[in-house]
Amino acid sequence: MHVAFATQPAPGSTVNEDAIAATDRVVVLLDGASIPHGLEIGCRHSTAWYVAQLGTELLEQLTDQRDQLLTDALASAIHAVASLHADTCQLDHPGGPSAAVALLREADQTVDYLVLADTTILLDEPAGIQVISDDRLAQVAVTEHSAMHREATGSLTHQRRYAELVTELRRHRNQAEGYWVASSNPDAAYHALTGSIRRLDVRRAALLTDGATRLVDRFQIMAWPHLLDLLDREGPYALIKQTREAESTDPEGRRWPRSKRHDDASAILCRFRCCPVPSDG
């Protein structure tokens, strides 16, 4: 499996809360949840710290134990990271650092995947593009989402509405009728979307944070097949560049209401060995 990726913090930010880790068999993509200023989190560590630790643990789990179920690997990684700060932080706090997760593994006969929270995986199969996306987060706190989207992105009122949204989301985090995300509870791993497809049926795959899917799901400028072709033709940085250009045409979110003017954006393209890999030249 040939892997190409790009990741970029939101313009104006020096901290990237996304994380990528990869080998020629395993790809890990994490999207850390942003925390509005002023909200308590019960933890001395940042979201960036959390995704860095979780990414490292996941890659170790998946490379050391190649036959391990992806859910088991994620559960073990969540437990391992929790143990790193169990003595210093309030692990049961609903606002503690958390992350959405996307995993892809090339096995001998299959390609295995896992999606937890708002990340997306695209699989290029003979029947077309399969889209695996966990939308449970969007199904809760609907009233708070709507209230935030009525305000100009970045305004003081928008910031207050965003904090209210996050406060409400915390009530539903890792709950049966809410949504699931990687944080301190290993059980969240077993609520991920998972699957396997025949190795020979996959030509390309993409793993995307929600900051890299905006051209399709938020802005509706292109469709998933076009996004995958853009990644393949011009590379992951080109996707992020086009996303930034679109964001800049609507800084206040009047055309495309959203929680943040810009978001951290990460995109990974995987090409499989059954298919010729274009030269870089």
What residue ranges belong to the model's regions?
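PP2C/PPM-type serine/threonine phosphatase catalytic domain
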Residues: 1-281
